[in-house]
């Protein structure tokens, strides 16, 4: 009986060691894609809800996912701050009437929606050298 218990204990220990030293069942976290590079000068054509179109300019500085820079529109100018997450961008103007731009980056072009005080419109932008 004692011999049986010893064999059983050794077998259990052996199985535990084999399973414990095998490949980990925990999955590795997915590799994060780096954010798109949006640093530079952009010209924005904003289509407001009333059907008007205005041209705006933004110069973006990028540090990883963080964005800062300068915004110039037809009636106001000021700083910007925002983020970029892979192909998605969000930035806000630091102006009297704060504008929030959200969009998708596609190389040297971006497009999306913007808003101010509950009113929303669409925008398209392209990299430039103004």
Name these PLM-found stretches.
Residues 1-11:
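Bacterial N-terminal signal peptides that target proteins for export
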Residues 12-20:
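Bacterial N-terminal signal peptides
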Residues 20-21, 113:
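Generic alpha-helical structural signal
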Residues 22-26:
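Sec/Tat signal peptide C-region and signal peptidase I cleavage site
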Residues 27-130:
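Central antiparallel beta-sheet cores of small beta-barrel/beta-sandwich binding domains
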């Amino acid at each position: 009986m004692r011999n049986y218990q010893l064999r059983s204990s050794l077998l259990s220990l052996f199985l535990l060691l084999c399973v414990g030293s095998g490949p980990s069942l925990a999955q590795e976290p997915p590799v994060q894609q780096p954010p798109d590079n949006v640093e530079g000068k952009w010209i924005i054509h904003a289509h407001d809800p009333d059907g008007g179109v205005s041209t705006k300019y933004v110069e973006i500085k990028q540090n990883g996912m963080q964005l800062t820079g300068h915004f110039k529109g037809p009636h106001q100018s000021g700083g910007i701050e925002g983020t970029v997450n892979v192909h998605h961008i969000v930035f806000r103007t630091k102006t009297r009437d704060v504008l929030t731009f959200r969009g998708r980056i596609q190389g040297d072009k971006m497009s999306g929606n913007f808003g101010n005080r509950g009113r929303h419109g669409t925008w398209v932008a392209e990299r430039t050298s103004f």
